[in-house]
């Protein structure tokens, strides 16, 4: 990839990182190259922050089943990824301490609303995520488009749909590139809405905050340059601007410079 920082939405749940076992298969049909891969991975991140924000908190992905297919035909590349995570454990209160009053008040609520609170604070959820991509590269000019969809069980996480399109031009050892993308998040549970409608004064602030945190309708631009001064080392510089229609406080401009090593 040309970027220093990957597009946030499409890569907020990794497809290929973690500890585990895997199997790969490669075959050819004329000019078509087909690569298939299956991984059984587990992963723990101590300071995970969702794309919608929050404090760093521990997240653990247990026994993730990941299947990938990648195909190359002359100058074209296309494929897809499927991931099923039977159990994702997340420290919801660690990431959102403002929700602690919800837990304290739960015992005094009617059973239905109490279940809604526990649904929001559920820290063990099932996840299904997939993406598809297609690219073209003639060695000088390249383009790539990718779409991803992440679906969480009933929890405080947001279901997310993301896409981006990128293009670039290589000149000598330099690569110039630009990317445009959009991320759209919707609450995976409507429990927060039910609690808000119940007009529970003691919980209103926390619930309303969670509702807003789960929503995202953002778009971003990335412009960057890469300089390959060695076959295994590249200097990268990216400028990213993010605009959010639902929450202007998440809007940002980021300039990043770094070295990319390939071992």
Locations of regions flagged by a protein language model:
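Surface-exposed coil loops of outer-membrane beta-barrel proteins
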Residues: 1-68, 199
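Outer-membrane beta-barrel "beta-signal"
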Residues: 251-263
């Amino acid at each position: 990839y040309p970027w220093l920082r990957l597009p946030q939405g499409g890569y907020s749940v990794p497809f290929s990182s973690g500890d585990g076992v895997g199997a790969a298969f490669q075959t050819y049909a004329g000019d078509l190259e087909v690569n298939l891969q299956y991984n059984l991975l587990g992963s723990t991140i101590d300071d995970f922050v969702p794309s919608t924000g929050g404090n760093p908190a521990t997240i653990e992905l247990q026994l993730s089943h990941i299947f990938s297919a990648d195909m190359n035909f002359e100058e074209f590349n296309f494929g897809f990824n499927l991931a099923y995570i039977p159990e994702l454990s997340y420290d919801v209160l660690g990431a959102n301490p403002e929700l602690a009053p919800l837990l304290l008040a739960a015992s005094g609520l009617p059973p239905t609303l109490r279940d809604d609170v526990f649904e929001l604070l559920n820290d063990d959820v099932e996840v299904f995520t997939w993406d598809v991509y297609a690219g073209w590269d003639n060695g000088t000019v390249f383009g790539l488009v990718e779409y991803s969809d992440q679906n969480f069980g009933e929890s405080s996480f947001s279901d997310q749909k993301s896409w981006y399109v990128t293009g670039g031009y290589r000149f000598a050892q330099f690569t110039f590139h630009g990317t445009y993308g959009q991320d759209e998040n919707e609450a995976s549970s409507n429990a927060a809405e039910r609690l808000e409608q119940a007009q529970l004064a003691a919980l209103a602030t926390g619930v309303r905050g969670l509702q807003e945190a789960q929503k995202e309708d953002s778009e971003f631009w990335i412009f960057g340059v890469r300089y390959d001064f060695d076959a295994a080392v590249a200097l990268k510089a990216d400028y990213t601007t993010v605009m959010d229609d639902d929450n202007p406080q998440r809007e940002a401009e980021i300039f990043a410079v770094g070295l990319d090593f390939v071992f």
